[in-house]
Structures are given as structure tokens and as C-alpha cells.
Swiss-Prot record:
Organism, scientific name: Metamycoplasma hominis (strain ATCC 23114 / DSM 25592 / NBRC 14850 / NCTC 10111 / PG21)
Keywords: ATP-binding, Cytoplasm, DNA-binding, Isomerase, Magnesium, Metal-binding, Nucleotide-binding, Topoisomerase
Molecular function GO labels: ATP binding; DNA binding; DNA negative supercoiling activity; metal ion binding
GN (gene name): gyrB
Cofactor(s) the protein requires to work: Mg(2+); Mn(2+); Ca(2+)
Entries under SMART domains matching the protein: HATPase_c, TOP2c
Subcellular location: Cytoplasm
Enzyme class: isomerase
InterPro entries: DNA_gyrase_B_C, GyrB, HATPase_C_sf, Ribosomal_Su5_D2-typ_SF, Ribsml_uS5_D2-typ_fold_subgr, Topo_IIA, Topo_IIA-like_dom_sf, Topo_IIA_B
Protein name: DNA gyrase subunit B
High-level lineage: Bacteria, Bacillati, Mycoplasmatota, Mycoplasmoidales, Metamycoplasmataceae
EC number: 5.6.2.2
One Pfam family recorded for the sequence: DNA_gyraseB
Amino acid sequence: MDKIEEIHKYNADNIQILEGLEAVRKRPGMYIGSIGFKGLHHLLWEIVDNSVDEAMAGFATEIKIKLYPNNVIEVEDNGRGMPTGIHSGTKKSAVETILTVLHAGGKFDGSNYKVSGGLHGVGASVVNALSSEFEVWVKRDGKLHYQQFRNGGIPVKPLEVIGNVSEVETGTTIKFHPDYTIMEKENFDFDTIIDHSKQIAYLNKGLKITVENVEKNIIKVFCFEGGLIDYVKELNKGKKLIVPEVIYAEGVFNDKNFTNGQDVIVEVAMQYNEAYTNSIVSYANNIQTIDGGTHEQGFYDALVRIYNNYAETNKLFKTSSEKITREDVKEGLVAIISIKHTDPIFEGQTKGKLENKDARIATNKILSDSLERYLNENPEIARAIIEKCLLSQHTRLLEIKAREASRKGNGLDLGNLPGKLADCSSKNAEIRELFIVEGNSAGGSAKMGRDRSIQAILPLRGKVINAEKNSFASVLSNKEIATMIHALGTGINTEFDINKLKYHKIIIMTDADVDGAHITTLLLTFFYRYMKPLIEYGFVYLAQPPLYKITSGKNVEYAYNDLQKEQIMAKLEDKRNVAIQRYKGLGEMDPEQLWETTMDPETRKMLQVQIDDAAICDTVFATLMGEEIEPRHDFIQENAKYANNIDI
């Protein structure tokens, strides 16, 4: 069936309406999560997702994203183009129906989209509702159609034909400006757009995505013919590999006993390296499932079963009772799991966890077949993988024994560790704050200046271990790490339980110099590798102490960066009698100053640590904190231009 015939099949009557659009402007958070930075970019991704759905359906091969000045953004695809006929229910064009009626779209009609990221007919209308200006161009049936909306989806005039195009030239272009009477005054971040677009291109092999900053004349083009294989190679760049090539599995699972006759498309790419950590990222219909789900369970089911079968058959186990478990297969593993499902079921509105039972069966089946064949064809690599798993198991069992000994008082006594915790009096974890403070002097000032009812202080008096370079056993034996684990109360790694967290704000407070930045990075590396939910749930913050104290007579002001310092100086009438103190360390502030500038919940500035893209975060941590020197050198060279406030 050719494209023209498919275009005619996808028409106005395919658009089904579920409910109206009235609530979006009143309660935008219900639809896009927030009205800040994340919500702003969510608007863009809703439009991009529609274009990606056209690509997954086999009709679009290219998506173009253009960022214009003043936060105007445009998304163009070469898919079929929105239907332009009159909708029988609304008596308006299908384009206007899609863009002004919530839950109106072609995604509810299974004949048009076999898989999509969700009910994305919702997305286009929500973006229109939250835009001050919204324009759409549709190339379809040899015509160029156009419609404009203003002030939250109010049509300026009905859809009209403004030109002719060739019969085979099709697609949709949407251009919008967020409504800043509703959205917070945040800017689209070009780097964020680039990173997310690159991820989409990896997940949809052969799809070309062009991202352009029109004002700065910067153009990035992403197209990966290798798809997930290229993705894993990128994540493993600069790492010492155990498996020289990427193991790849791809297939379509369709068993009427499990899938009701509908296809589940599975792709898995994986490769082992010599690191102690892992990077396992999963997606369902291009949506990152940060909390995993049934497809991840199927992935582990396959690894454990195939590895155990291979080890038993080839007599690689030393005893008959020896078995590889799920925890043993993770060390050094970089893997991307991606499934495409006709009817994905997610846990909650954030779509962080996939719940379809057939996804587990499908992933297990597709991966098992390919992995078993690969191991049998590559016995040396298979042996290296099994040995890696068994070594990981041996280390893990030793760690369990060490923890048990510690709990019985035979091992490390956490109560007598250096960096003694000065706890707060409140028992309510939701309002309790833990300041992890660099050095004794700053720790002393923080203890004296804090609000003792809700603020606890944990001074770091020794060296924090690099969790990227060292084994889990070595990490656990580090006294500073052990103190933090004890203070937080959650346990660590596989024993981590977020419900046992004693503080809902964990605030890293270090000096504003190179050493302070290094300590912050070491702590974040540890949290990311072994307590990642702390970051995912938004519990980790970076304190922002001032860089300058500016005294003019009796007037004292604090500047948190050089620009702020210049602004304060510019408004001072008497510039001759001004004293500027550049803080090199937290210890230079007395308790009152530290409270006023950095710890007072009413006036302080803090940065919340967030993970926008787990795979990118993983690459950055591995590059900066790993063993290999050359990738780190390259990263610093490429990103040095973005560095500020460097002490030389």
C-alpha cells in the first residue's frame, strides 16, 4: 500500500473526541507536570512525540526542530500531515479539532498508529492551550494548509489553503510561543533540546533529526543507522571492554495467548566493560522508564537463565549449588532496552514504570534466543562474561558478610566514625535537612548557625572515595561514605529503601573553589551510583554560598557571582569606600553570616540536582571520574568554554 493511499485512509473521521479543553489553562500542572523549566520543555516534547509517532508508524523519515529568538520554537516532520477534512462531530476541520479539543487525535484509532508514546492527541491541544501564539502548516493532498491560534487556542480564522505542493509532499509544521502569563519565565535550553533529540535518534534508527538555533546559526544533525548499537558504543566510549562488540537482539513477539494478537517489538543492545558500576536504561515507545518495569524484568530473566544454562552446560560452576543471580549480571554492564507496544500501560502520570505483562515475556523471549546463540558462537567471550558475573557474586557475598559482622559489632563501628553527626530535634523527615559540610571549621560554624530543630550537620573530615573507580567493597570501607550511609538511614545499592530516608533535603555545602567542586563531584558520583533514587526523587541539593561580601559603610550585601557583584557595585553611590571580600571557603564566614547567606530557608539559594537523561549522566560520570585519561581530557577541552568562577 503506497503513501498516497495511506494518507486517504487517515482522514477526519479517524479523529475521536473524548472531552473538552477547559481545564488546561486553569490547572496546567495536571497536564505537563510543572509550569517551570521541565514543563516548558514538556510542551516541545509533546509536539516532537507526535512527529516521532509518525516515524514509528513508517511515514516520517525526518524531523526538524528550530529555536527562534524570544522562545519561539518550531517542529516540522515529513509524515502524512494532519487530516484536513471536516470532522463529523465538531463540524470543524480535523486540524482545528486536534488542536483545540483535549483528547482529540488519531492515536485512539488503532488503525493509524500501532504504537505511540501515549495519547498524544492530548499533547497538541495542551500545547496550544498554553501558548500565546500557535501556528500550524499542513502539506497534504497537494495543498498547503494554514491556521493560526492566539491566547490559549483561540482560532484567528478557520483552516485555509495558502498554496500548492506536490502530491507526494506531505507533513506537519507547528510553531508556537509559550504563554508566559501561565508559564514561568524560563527559556528553552538548546543543549537540553540537543541531548533529548539525540536520544530520540538513537532509539529510532535511521530517523534524521535536525536541531537548529536560528539566532546563533548552530545546526546539529542526528541520524544513527545502528540505533541502539550506536547508543551503547557511545556510553562505553573510553571504557575497557570485556566484550569487544555490542550484543544485539531484535524481534517481534506475537503470541495470541499473551498479546491478544498484537505485536510487541523488542530491541536490546548490551556490552560488558571492566567497571564496577553499570548503566542499564530502558524505554517503552521512546519514553524513558526510569523506574524500570516488566520489560526490564524480562531482560534480567533472560540474562540469568541463559548465563546459568551456559555455565552449567560448560561446567563453569565450581559447585552444583552455585547459581548466578540478577544482582551478579549487572556489574560492568551497559544496556539499552527498548520496546514498542500497541497499548502501553504505565504506572502513574509520569510514565516511569511499564506494567504490561506481555512486555516481560516478549523481552525475555527475544533476548534469550539471540543471547544463547551469541554465547554458543563466541565461547571465549561467554567465559569472560560468566567469570565477570561470578567475581561480582563473590564480592557481593563478602560485602554481605561484612555488613552482618558490622551490625553485630564485630566490624566497623559507625557510631565512632569521624565526622560526627549533629542531628536536629524534629522527627518529621519531610522537614528535616542534612547539611553535608566540607571541613571542620565550616562544620563548626554550621553547627552554631543552624536551626537546630530541622537542620542536622555532618562534617566531612577525611577523603571521600571515588565511587566510579573503586569496587563496592572499597566504597563501603570508606569512613566518610559509611558515615553518610548511617546518617541517611536508607541502606545502599540493592538494600536501598527510600521510605527509610531520615531527611528530605540532603544539602551538599562545600567551598566555592576547585577542591570544593571536587568534593561535590565525588559525593554526587556516590549518590548517582549507589543511591540514585535520592536524586531521582529530588532530595539532593547543592548549597550556593556567596562568592563576595560587599561592604559600603554600614551597608553589607552578598553577591553569588561576578555579574551580581557588578550590579551591586553599579548602584553604589560612593564607590571609593567599598570593601570587597572574596570568600575562598565557608570557614571564612561566622555562624551568623553562614546562616544568613546559605542556610536560612527563607533567603538561601540552592540548586536541586536532577537527572534529565540517565544515559547522558552516566556517560559524564564515567568520563570525568573513571580510569581512562584521554576521554576526560577530551571532555574538558570540549566543555572548558562553559566553565565559570574558576580559581587559578
